[in-house]
Amino acid sequence: MSSLIKSINLDKINHSQSTVKDYILLMKPRVMSLVIFTCFVGMLLAPYSVHPFIASIAVVCIAFGAGSAGAINMWYDRDIDSLMKRTQKRPIVRGAIEPDEALSFGLITGFFAVFFMALCVNLLASFLLLFTIFYYICIYTIWLKRRSIQNIVIGGVSGALPPVIGYAAVSNTISLQSVILFLIILIWTPPHSWALALFCNEDYKNCKVPMMPTIKGALYAKKQILIYSFLLFIVSLMPFFIGMSNFIYLIISGILGLVFLYYAGSLFYDTPDNKQAKRLFVYSIFYLFFIFLLLYLTNTILSISER
């Protein structure tokens, strides 16, 4: 009898642990981590000081705001997630979380994220967070994703807003500096997403999501990736020319951008297993991380040298 009770208790503990993990997965933690990082850099680049407690609340609100959008996205896309290999293990598809529970979780976390941002930080940051959640769910997920070949180009607005929210959380303004951070992510999104679509092309075909390689073909998509990579190279240098960073940033970001262009160009010589597309996809993640980290470090050096 004691062994049976122990077994039941262990099952309850394991179920509880898996549920917590599943709710974390529901919020798309990989995407959330990049959102938090770019938001935090936006906060650090703002030319104002903020109390660490307020800054912490802002970061938590943005994290849960992003998580709520991810949860509602999984709720809405549960039908096509079951058809794609890379999304078949998501919590709703596996039955770990019921669709209604996921929707409720997303709505509640989103509401409290926006509410506490308004209550503890400022109304501008709260409005931008609300707009970002709305845009990702309604404009991208519901309207564009299954209808337009430009889904991630237009839909990328929501993914590019976190540093603007972070900047606004500290300064209560939107400036040229935060707009440039926005543009870097906005232009980075198409080559990043289309590289993924190149090696997941069959998945997108199966679920009938009109990604660029699926509708226009791989060659056309590769040309578009190269164009956007060139635009990204130009935009990534802008922080130097508006006095947001120093010469070190110009040199290193230029090198990182040239490597990005190299990987984009190598797509035209890709193998059937899409090896180069996978390399570009992975590199693009590291690229964005290092560009934002470099911006923060060189901006800090510039600020110290001007004192």
UniProtKB/Swiss-Prot annotation:
The keyword Glycosyltransferase does not apply. It comes from the Bacteria. Pathway: Porphyrin-containing compound metabolism; heme O biosynthesis; heme O from protoheme: step 1/1. It is a multi-pass membrane protein. One of its GO terms (cellular component) is plasma membrane. The chain crosses the membrane at residues 31-51, 52-72, 102-119, 123-145, 151-171, 179-199, 225-245, 247-267, 281-301. Signal peptide: none annotated. GO terms for biological process: heme O biosynthetic process. Keywords: Cell inner membrane, Cell membrane, Heme biosynthesis, Membrane, Transferase, Transmembrane, Transmembrane helix. It is found in: Cell inner membrane. It is an enzyme of class 2 (transferase). Its main location: membrane. PANTHER family: 4-HYDROXYBENZOATE SOLANESYLTRANSFERASE, PROTOHEME IX FARNESYLTRANSFERASE, MITOCHONDRIAL. Converts heme B (protoheme IX) to heme O by substitution of the vinyl group on carbon 2 of heme B porphyrin ring with a hydroxyethyl farnesyl side group. This is Protoheme IX farnesyltransferase. The gene is ctaB.
